[in-house]
Regions:
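Charge-biased low-complexity segments
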Residues: 4-7, 18-131
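Repetitive helical segments and hydrophobic/amphipathic motifs
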Residues: 11-12
Length: 131
């Protein structure tokens, strides 16, 4: 009896380990990308990239782009948000905050018919008008 249990465990253990590894893997390419309501997403980004006058006074006029990378997990939650570049003036942190404060729900990415963690990238553009 002990031999049967031991043999069963030896057979099942590799599959359990592979499944655990798959759940932790973050996909870069997927069959279906994670998505959210585009109208709500665009409105959120537009609203959150409006800089207050106190910040505009401290930054030279111009257009500043911050590329943000984040992960949408299998439940549609956003995490691991980071700026891939920093134009300075605290704009990278502001861009990360744009993503982290979004309250809309994400649909996770899909690979082989199941939800998976996947990277997303979003450019955040700040426009500072000439004074």
């Amino acid at each position: 009896m002990k031999g049967i249990i031991f043999t069963s465990l030896l057979f099942l253990l590799p599959f359990m380990v592979l499944k655990a590894q798959d759940e932790n893997k973050v996909f870069e390419k997927v069959e279906q990308n994670a998505n959210t309501n585009q109208k709500t997403w665009n409105e959120h980004i537009s609203r959150k990239t409006q800089l207050p006058d106190s910040v505009i006074k401290e930054i030279p006029a111009g257009t500043y782009k911050v590329n943000i990378q984040f992960v949408v997990d299998i439940h549609g939650n956003v995490g691991q948000i980071k700026a891939k570049n920093d134009p300075g003036y605290g704009l990278a942190k502001m861009a990360v905050d744009v993503i982290s404060t979004y309250k809309g729900k994400w649909q996770p990415a899909n690979q082989c018919g199941r939800n998976v963690k996947a990277y997303k990238e979003q450019p955040i553009i700040f426009i500072v008008p000439a004074q």
